Curated annotation (Swiss-Prot):
Protein keywords: Isomerase
Name assigned to this protein: Probable tautomerase bsl7456
Signal peptide (UniProt feature, chain positions): none
Family membership noted in the UniProt record: Belongs to the 4-oxalocrotonate tautomerase family.
UniProt organism field: Bradyrhizobium diazoefficiens (strain JCM 10833 / BCRC 13528 / IAM 13628 / NBRC 14792 / USDA 110)
Amino acid sequence: MPEITVSMAEGRTDEQKAGMMRDITQALVKNLGVDADAVVIQINEAPLRHKMKGGKTFVERAAAAKK
């Protein structure tokens, strides 16, 4: 049973996350030959203030992009 964990910043809708999980499931069915019922996907979301890239939190990066 393949288990996939997706770590990402918060902010996507439930519909977006469900679509992503469906697409990942189908990719595993196609490429690994497993049944969809065997695929487990978990999303771990972090607040934007708890994620950093390039020495700036995602909150800081978003604020800089608006300028």
